[in-house]
């Protein structure tokens, strides 16, 4: 399975493409879609859309995992990140790719096994799972890879439960 992990934002959208096959991970590509701060918000959203659309079209993506919006005290920032999430989801939907959302707690549990893990612990596990020589930068890229790994683990659990007649909640 080829999974695209996305850490949404308006200035930086981290992405990570992994292959999960036979319980093994392989990094295919990772990086960031960036937008200049001085640019009009509608133009920035267009750049985010086009960047994700190009990534989805260039790879044989099966599914997409995306981090849910973490609401902070800055409402204006939360709104622009929500807008970026929307155009990112739209780019995936236009290409027929299902998007699964995960909270930061779920991502940490799915990668480290502990929902209160710190950023360094998550990055260390991402590097280990994907056999990378160093932690991907910026942090948004490592976060996107973590989302992809979390989705692989969640998807495997859901399929296992379906096979035994259970239900994943």
UniProtKB/Swiss-Prot annotation:
Organism field? Clostridioides difficile (strain 630)
- Name assigned to this protein: Crossover junction endodeoxyribonuclease RuvC
Look up keyword Magnesium and say if it applies. Answer: yes
Active site, per annotation: 7, 67, 140
* Reactions catalysed: Endonucleolytic cleavage at a junction such as a reciprocal single-stranded crossover between two homologous DNA duplexes (Holliday junction)
**NCBIfam families, alphabetically?**
PRK00039.2-1, ruvC
Q: What GO terms describe the biological role, i.e. biological process, of this protein?
A: DNA recombination; DNA repair
Q: Where does Mg(2+) 1 bind?
A: 7, 140
List the Gene3D superfamilies hit by this protein, alphabetically.
Ribonuclease H-like superfamily/Ribonuclease H (3.30.420.10)
Binding of Mg(2+) 2 occurs at: 67
Where would you find this protein in the cell? Cytoplasm
Q: What does this protein do?
A: The RuvA-RuvB-RuvC complex processes Holliday junction (HJ) DNA during genetic recombination and DNA repair. Endonuclease that resolves HJ intermediates. Cleaves cruciform DNA by making single-stranded nicks across the HJ at symmetrical positions within the homologous arms, yielding a 5'-phosphate and a 3'-hydroxyl group; requires a central core of homology in the junction. The consensus cleavage sequence is 5'-(A/T)TT(C/G)-3'. Cleavage occurs on the 3'-side of the TT dinucleotide at the point of strand exchange.
The family annotation for this protein states: Belongs to the RuvC family.
User: Cellular component GO terms, alphabetically?
Assistant: cytoplasm; Holliday junction resolvase complex
The record's cofactor note says: Binds 2 Mg(2+) ion per subunit.
A Pfam family per the record: RuvC
What EC number(s) does this enzyme carry? 3.1.21.10
């Amino acid at each position: 399975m080829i999974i695209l992990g996305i850490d949404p934002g308006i200035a930086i959208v981290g992405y990570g493409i992994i292959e999960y096959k036979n319980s093994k991970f392989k990094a295919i590509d990772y990086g960031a879609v960036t937008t200049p701060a001085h640019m009009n918000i509608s133009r920035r959203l267009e750049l985010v859309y086009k960047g994700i659309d190009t990534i989805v079209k260039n790879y044989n993506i099966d599914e997409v995992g995306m981090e849910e919006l973490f609401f902070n005290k800055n409402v204006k920032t939360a709104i622009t990140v929500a807008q970026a999430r929307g155009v990112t989801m739209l780019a995936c939907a236009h290409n027929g790719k299902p998007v699964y959302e995960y909270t930061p707690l779920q991502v940490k549990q799915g990668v480290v096994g502990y929902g209160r893990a710190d950023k360094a612990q998550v990055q260390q596990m991402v590097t280990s799972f994907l056999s990378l020589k160093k932690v991907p930068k910026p942090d948004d890229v490592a976060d996107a890879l973590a989302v992809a790994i979390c989705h692989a683990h969640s998807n495997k659990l859901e399929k296992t439960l379906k096979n035994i007649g259970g239900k994943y909640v």
